[in-house]
UniProtKB/Swiss-Prot annotation:
Pfam families: URO-D
Species this chain originates from: Pectobacterium atrosepticum (strain SCRI 1043 / ATCC BAA-672) (Erwinia carotovora subsp. atroseptica)
Amino-acid positions noted as binding substrate in the UniProt annotation, renumbered to this chain: R27, Q28, A29, G30, R31, D77, Y154, T209, H327
Disulfide bonds: none
Name of the protein: Uroporphyrinogen decarboxylase
GO biological process: protoporphyrinogen IX biosynthetic process from glutamate
Subunit structure: Homodimer.
Pathway as given in its UniProt record: Porphyrin-containing compound metabolism; protoporphyrin-IX biosynthesis; coproporphyrinogen-III from 5-aminolevulinate: step 4/4
Keyword set includes Lyase: yes
GO MF, any single term: uroporphyrinogen decarboxylase activity
């Protein structure tokens, strides 16, 4: 495999010295870019885009052609695992992801298979290999998965949810059923992420988008426990380098200490966390990723720069910070504003690494 020309993202995740703070954006390959919309139209629909390795590679690389980003992230979806389990993922216009066969009973969970990542999810591994080859060592490639809890919310609710009443009914009325589902999902995520690492992903991230919907006790039992199991079972070295693992729970700022105990290398922060406070609490154990409000990219360039400066000052001198948004970039953000953001992070962060 080609040597990395820019490894500052990997170094920052391991709290090693860097010259400037690395930056990438969640959903950096996406609908805010006109070239993405053109490629998606060529593919026909979202899942066809995910399943075509050449087109998935193209959209992964598109933001790197525009911006001096320090990492690429695999273009895929968190719901590939439930789809591979046979739930029948589809996308309803204006409603987001849905499943033809949601989980409604203990029997449904018992019969769920654990997918083979090189078979049912082989298209994802083909995309990883294709992207890695085309990156030619410019920047590292991030692989990812949804967390067991977050995947379970979609599988039990049948799609997106605001109140999570269906899965919480299962959690409180049939906890054994939910634990069986989460255990199967954790096993599936372990196989899936390890296959991505073998295929060429140089870092991995677990997205726990809906962990913040839980109470502290329930979060530890139904979400964090299973992410801990995943971290314990991941291949942490490949091609002679450590493969860093980042955990991100949206709305999880109150649980950073518990998250840091999992043995992960970094924690993602959403914009509701104060990065200075987070560093005081867990900065001796993990790197931190984040955490500008994605809506700040609607502001004028001077305001975006001001916010970047504020977050850099909050983290302070030294290593262990990967700059990012606190969640995915919005689809109607002007692409030039994303450019202002990336350039400002690099220019303003140099003083913090002197």
């Amino acid at each position: 495999m080609t040597d990395l020309k820019n490894d500052r993202y990997l170094r920052a995740l391991l709290r090693q010295p860097v010259d400037i703070t690395p930056v990438w954006m969640m959903r950096q390959a996406g609908r805010y870019l006109p070239e993405y919309k053109a490629t998606r139209a060529q593919a026909g629909d979202f899942m066809s885009l995910c399943k075509n390795a050449e087109l998935a590679c193209e959209v992964t690389l598109q933001p790197l052609r525009r911006y001096a980003l320090d990492a690429a992230i695999l273009f895929s979806d968190i719901l590939t695992i439930p789809d591979a389990m046979g739930l029948g993922l589809y996308f309803e216009a204006g409603e987001g992801p849905r499943f033809h066969s949601p989980i409604t009973s203990h029997a449904d969970v018992v019969k769920l298979p654990v997918p083979d990542p090189e078979q049912e999810l082989g298209y994802v591994m083909n995309a990883v290999r294709t992207i890695r080859k085309n990156l030619a060592g410019e920047v590292p490639l991030i692989g990812f998965s949804g967390s067991p809890w977050t995947l379970a919310t979609y599988m039990v609710e049948g799609g997106s949810s605001k109140a999570f009443t269906v899965i919480k009914k299962m959690m409180f009325a049939e906890p054994k059923t939910l634990h069986l589902l989460l255990d199967k999902l954790a096993d599936s995520v372990i196989l899936y992420l390890n296959a991505q690492i073998r295929a060429g992903a140089q870092a991995v991230m677990v997205f726990d988008t809906w962990g913040g919907a839980l109470s502290g006790r329930d979060y530890k039992e139904f979400s964090l426990h299973y992410m801990h199991k995943i971290v314990d079972s991941l291949q942490r070295e490949n091609e002679g380098r450590r493969v860093p693992v980042t955990l991100f729970t949206k709305g999880g700022g109150q649980w950073l200490e518990a998250m840091a105990e999992t043995g992960c290398d970094a924690l993602g922060l959403d914009w509701t966390s104060d990065i200075a406070d987070a560093r005081r609490r867990v900065g001796d154990k993990v790197a931190l990723q984040g955490n500008m409000d994605p809506s700040m990219l609607y502001a004028d360039p001077a305001r975006i720069e001001q916010e970047v400066a504020s977050i850099l000052a909050g983290f302070g001198q030294g290593n262990g910070h990967v700059f990012n948004l606190g969640h995915g970039i919005h689809q109607d953000v002007p692409p030039e504003h994303a450019g202002v953001f990336v350039e400002a992070v690099h220019r303003l962060s140099r003083a913090y690494h002197a």
